[in-house]
Amino acid sequence: MNPSRCRIIAIGKVRKSWVQDGIELYRKRLPGLTIVELRDSNPEKEAESIRQTLRRDEWPVMLMEQGETLTSINFSERLRSLGSQRLAFVIGGADGLTAELKALAHWKLSLSPMTFPHELARLLLIEQLFRAQAILQGSPYHRA
C-alpha cells in the first residue's frame, strides 16, 4: 500500500482537538496521504463537491454503513490486491452520501455496522490505513 496513492475526501472540518491530534499522529506515519476537507452543506451540494474533487484516475471508495465490513487483515489484503490503483476514500457528511454518489463507488466500505460521527470515522479510517501498511510490512504494530 502506497499512501501517496490514497486520498481521504471528507465533508466537514474536524472540530474536536483530540480527534485532530489522532489524525495528525497517523498522517505523520503515512507520508504522502492527502486529506481533502470539503464544506458541509446539504447532501446534493456535498455530492457535487465530492464529484468535482474526484480525479478520473481514482477509484472512489465510499464509506457507508451498508458497505463491506472487513477485518484489518482482510482490509490490508484488499489494498495490496489493488496494487498501484489510486484510491479516494470518501466520507460523507451528517446525512451520508447520496444514492448517485454510492453508485459511483468502485468499493463500498463499512468501518463497522455501527454509525460514527464523520470526524471519528476519519480517525478510524486513517488508523486502519496505517495498520494495513504495518500488516503488509510485517511490522509489530498489528497484534492479532
UniProtKB/Swiss-Prot annotation:
From the UniProt record, list the reaction(s) this protein catalyses: pseudouridine(1915) in 23S rRNA + S-adenosyl-L-methionine = N(3)-methylpseudouridine(1915) in 23S rRNA + S-adenosyl-L-homocysteine + H(+)
Which Gene Ontology molecular-function terms are recorded? Answer: rRNA (pseudouridine-N3-)-methyltransferase activity
User: What CDD domains does the entry give?
Assistant: RlmH-like
What GO CC annotations are associated with the protein? cytoplasm
The UniProt entry, under SUPFAM superfamilies, shows: alpha/beta knot
Major localization class: cytoplasm
Give one Pfam hit by family name.
SPOUT_MTase
What Enzyme Commission number(s) apply to this enzyme? 2.1.1.177
Which keywords annotate this record?
Cytoplasm, Methyltransferase, rRNA processing, S-adenosyl-L-methionine, Transferase
**Binding-site residues for S-adenosyl-L-methionine, renumbered to this chain:** G92, L111, S112, P113, M114, T115, F116
Domain of life according to the entry = Bacteria
Q: Where does this polypeptide localize?
A: Cytoplasm
Q: What does this protein do?
A: Specifically methylates the pseudouridine at position 1915 (m3Psi1915) in 23S rRNA.
Q: How does it assemble?
A: Homodimer.
Q: Which family does it belong to?
A: Belongs to the RNA methyltransferase RlmH family.
Q: What is this protein called?
A: Ribosomal RNA large subunit methyltransferase H
